[in-house]
């Protein structure tokens, strides 16, 4: 078995491109080799800022042979009445490179066709790779592509060399005017090269030993973490590692060398969030914390070389960071000299969404909506919730957030504390943007949860009124994330209120506006959108789709209750009684769904016991009446597990009813009474789940 190595050498690629390119190269080569019937063992793609390296081990040297049957024209037109081949048969044979006597009749469901057996494969794999490699390189996707020189070829950054080796032989092809070869280039300082690679097996060693490049991203990360931890320990601290920044840093270097720098301790007067953002955002550096968690006047950066004069390089990094921190200190002091009233006034000049008014308008709506939410779930914090809503966006006009927009909300909370606001208000303001994604936590405080819900509901109501509804992958205002955030907060914090009422109240907060959708139409579309997001959330948590639909059809306006009913239904679905219970109660639900609408005036679930003719009718009515007090008590206690357990009490009476009672009898009064008896059953069970949506 053989080894194939291909290295695409480029100018420095952005770190954010690398992970996606690794996946694209791997998937495209896997697909191309599968289509060509070439087998291989392992396929691995690694990257640095200046190279994309593919290694395929245990790859066949020769394409696997296969036989395929190619069908041609129908037999009836392939031969004339005398059985002689027609032009259709001759043309088919010629096209397939076959002799007429090699053709045979293929019988299919559609009739008889002329066909030929063809052997494929047997080509040297090097030939196949020389064809697919340049095609794959040219087709690699980038957020942005560029041209260079006088050619028309486009890529993420200019190509500089291409190495392609099949064992010790060069796989020859041309891409972007560059002819593939057996040479690679190394680190710009420590081993620029070019260096000849004797064979595919020698590639990794050449890159490591001669190029002085750490090809594996995991190895670069390990070198960074181990070296950084050692330097921090010498200073008596620990590095505040951040995974996303670590990923970015390893994508910025080929030869990582951790370097610990210092800054003036006077800068520690700034909030830790400001210091860390200055380091991480602008300098791609990490903070250092003491044992008690407080920041120390040090930072860790990662160099892309081993410097000859470490002290000089360290001094340069410190000088740049000092300038950043001086700016941050200026913003901090300027913001502390301002007050919330002046910021709130400025919000009236900051646009939220042009048709939806200013940020000042939004904070007034949030004040109103937060007060309403608090009245529903926590009346004792109504005033704090309203105040948090009013102050929520004030930091958007602060100097600090203007410079570091990632600190919005966080700085609002910090400034609220410094300016004497209630701690409940300050924490809520700092948590208002949570959760920021599927892995992000929800707000820790109740007031923060209410503010976050209000903010998201206000955005949803406004955008749906303007018909800015997400379609496909397009969601410019992150409305899906807003809906999921509301659902997660309600579920994880155990908040119970009617989401229809939430959206209606949020919609009313906009007052009279020129909407693109009528308010009732927008409200209905928003509710459907929210329920779909809730469904997706439950499915992503591992619940079966049919169970989720059954639970949500029974009611989704109380999100926490819907989740609790789903958990109980999920547990019930694993019991031995589930299958028969579904068949029984689904039958009742389907009868009501199909026949109920045909009854004049509909069905209300009220039946007349004097019209019962069969003992089974009386038994079912009696069973419903017997469990009613227990059912309502357990419903009030949210004991959904016990409620599903009551189905076992009801099922024998329902089964007996269906066995002996003709529901759709001739007498319209008796028929309607029996349908209302079933409606009474379905109404009660329908509060738990829509059994008609379940299947067995």
UniProtKB/Swiss-Prot annotation:
GO MF, any single term: arginine-tRNA ligase activity
Keyword Protein biosynthesis annotated: yes
Keywords linked to the UniProt accession: Aminoacyl-tRNA synthetase, ATP-binding, Cytoplasm, Ligase, Nucleotide-binding, Protein biosynthesis
Domain of life: Bacteria
Major subcellular site: cytoplasm
Gene Ontology CC: cytosol
Family: Belongs to the class-II aminoacyl-tRNA synthetase family.
Assembly mode: Tetramer of two alpha and two beta subunits.
InterPro entries: DALR_anticod-bd, Gly-tRNA-synth_bsu, Gly-tRNA-synth_heterodimer
Pfam families membership: DALR_1, tRNA_synt_2f
EC number: 6.1.1.14
Subcellular location: Cytoplasm
Name of the molecule in the record: Glycine--tRNA ligase beta subunit
Biological process according to GO: arginyl-tRNA aminoacylation; glycyl-tRNA aminoacylation
Catalytic activity from the UniProt record: tRNA(Gly) + glycine + ATP = glycyl-tRNA(Gly) + AMP + diphosphate
NCBIfam families documented for this protein: glyS
Alphabetized SUPFAM superfamilies for the sequence: HD-domain/PDEase-like (SSF109604)
PANTHER family named in the record: GLYCINE--TRNA LIGASE, CHLOROPLASTIC_MITOCHONDRIAL 2, GLYCYL-TRNA SYNTHETASE
Signal peptide: none
